A protein has these predicted regions:
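S-adenosyl-L-methionine-dependent methyltransferase catalytic core, i.e., the SAM/SAH-binding region
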Residues: 1-302
């Protein structure tokens, strides 16, 4: 778990926002500022930004998950009208933000993790620890669920997804076992099938990588990440800050490549003596390397 940056726990809700102190350090919220939490979840980061930007900083809080958004809205109901809540995908960030009057922002946050609300509710289908429907959709209205991927996608495509998005070395074996066991009934059945194909390693559940891969495919998480970062950059005021909290190497790679590219001028190959691309520096990287979660943070958010 780490955060890349360019130029409070709440026991009542059982929610501990990830790396909140680091987020506040780099976003440096101030009164009068405009901020976007593009993945608000249960609202922990938004709450901290509101507190730091009082009395009149404003936050646009976006999430694809209607259940999480409703909880965030309830817990922040005394915000004095400083938060605007919108259900939507962060890949549509620019359209949503402009419609709500949030351009020229001082800070934008993307927390790419799956929330405890989603993991703890077996009915959402994210967890392999309890039986639940094969769902895994962040947006319950989205057309593709895990059931479609697991029970209907061709074996070759399933293997590709598990290898690419789960970095599972036994992807072809796992995909073959899944196809053989169809129809897969629920998440417990899927976890058992995968566990029969993959040995446990390093204390990690054998189904961890496969579940991650299917979730990423269902929600097009990497495509959404690639789509949202240029939009976030376009919405920042001069001197504004974008912070991204990533949880695995696939996300981290996309974020790093974007920030490195946009912190450079000409992107033409060295063999071309005069710039033809016209690319200009778009941001300053505030950290050369991702900010890693502290040991205490990992203990609070394992």
């Amino acid at each position: 778990m780490g955060a890349s940056v360019g130029a409070t726990s709440d026991q009542e809700w059982g929610h501990v926002p990830v790396m909140v102190e680091e987020v506040l350090l780099y976003l440096a919220p101030r009164s009068g500022g405009l901020y976007i939490d593009a993945t608000v979840g249960l609202g922990g980061h938004t709450q901290a930004i509101l507190s730091r930007s009082a009395p009149d900083g404003r936050v646009l809080a976006i999430d694809a998950d209607a259940q999480a958004l409703a909880i965030a809205e309830r817990r922040l109901s005394d915000d004095g009208g400083r938060v605007t809540f919108v259900q939507g995908r962060h890949r549509d960030l620019e359209r949503i933000a402009v419609a709500q009057g949030f351009s020229g922002c001082q800070g934008i946050l993307l927390d790419l993790g799956v929330s405890s609300l989603q993991l703890d509710d077996a009915e959402r289908g994210f967890s392999f620890r309890e039986a639940g429907p094969l769902d895994m959709r962040m947006d319950s209205e989205a057309p593709v669920s895990a059931e479609e991927v697991v029970n209907h996608w061709p074996e070759q495509e399933l293997a590709r997804v598990i290898a690419a998005y789960g970095e599972e070395r036994y992807a072809r074996r796992v995909a073959h076992r899944i196809v053989q066991a169809r129809p897969i009934r629920d998440t417990a059945h899927l976890a058992a099938v995968v566990s029969g194909a993959v040995r446990s390693s390093g204390g990690i559940h054998p189904a961890t990588r496969t579940f991650q891969a299917i979730r990423i495919a269902v929600n097009d998480e990497l495509g959404s990440l690639e789509a949202v970062m240029p939009q976030a950059l376009a919405l920042l005021a001069p001197g504004g800050v974008m912070a991204v909290i990533a949880f695995h190497s696939l996300e981290d790679r996309i974020v790093k490549q974007f920030m490195v590219r946009e912190s450079r001028g000409c992107l033409c190959p060295p063999r071309i003596p005069v710039c033809e691309c016209g690319h200009r520096v778009q941001l300053d990287r505030l950290t050369r390397r991702p900010v890693q979660a502290s040991t205490g943070e990992i203990g609070r958010n394992p």
